[in-house]
């Protein structure tokens, strides 16, 4: 059995979700390759250390460049604010490391295309973190569509009922101009679902 050293950039909601998921692989899947939580990267050394202890990582850092350069880290998960995705992904791909990047890839179509091109040029595996399309309900819809049980889909409507901005004082990174707000955070899920269901 071999392991793969995981580095996660971002300790917030999705950083925690990925950390818990990787830590659970051995108890859920029978696989020869086991993820090992090597490094968590957060915006400050203090928060990185808190996440390291909470999620079970070996190391903590606030410098993503340091983490990408670490030979113990063999794959990178980008779960940081959207404005950081592009530079981190390009550096990780240049270092020869597979990347799982939360959506959206970049802040623009140009950034996203350059990230995809860099992965293709390097011949490195990369993936966007579209989790909703992997839910059992979504998989069942896809199965029904493939079997012709629903018929031809001619129209799609998506609705996301999230409460991120219910408190006008909250906002967080979604309220920052460079983050593309709720559209940048949630619309990719709807676009991905439409593509998966309708082709």
Regions found by a protein language model. Give the residues of each.
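Glycine-rich, N-terminal phosphate-binding loop of Rossmann-like dinucleotide-binding domains
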Residues: 79-80, 160
């Amino acid at each position: 059995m071999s392991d793969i050293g995981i580095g996660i950039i971002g300790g917030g909601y999705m950083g925690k979700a990925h950390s818990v998921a990787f830590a659970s692989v051995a108890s859920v899947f029978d696989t020869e390759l086991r993820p090992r939580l090597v490094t968590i990267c957060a915006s400050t050394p203090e928060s990185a250390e808190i996440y390291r202890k909470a999620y079970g990582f070996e190391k903590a850092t606030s410098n993503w460049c340091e983490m990408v350069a670490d030979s113990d880290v063999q794959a990178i998960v980008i779960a940081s604010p959207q404005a950081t995705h592009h530079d981190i992904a390009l550096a990780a791909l240049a270092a020869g490391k597979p990347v799982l990047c939360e959506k959206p890839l970049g802040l623009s179509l140009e950034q996203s295309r350059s990230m995809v091109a860099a992965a293709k040029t390097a011949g490195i595996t990369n993936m966007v973190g579209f989790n909703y399309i992997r839910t059992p309900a979504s998989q069942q819809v896809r199965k029904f569509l493939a079997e012709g049980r629903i018929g031809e889909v001619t129209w799609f409507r998506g609705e996301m009922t999230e409460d991120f901005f219910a408190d006008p004082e909250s906002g967080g990174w979604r309220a920052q101009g460079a983050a593309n707000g709720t559209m940048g955070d949630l619309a990719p899920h709807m676009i991905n679902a439409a593509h998966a269901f309708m082709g």
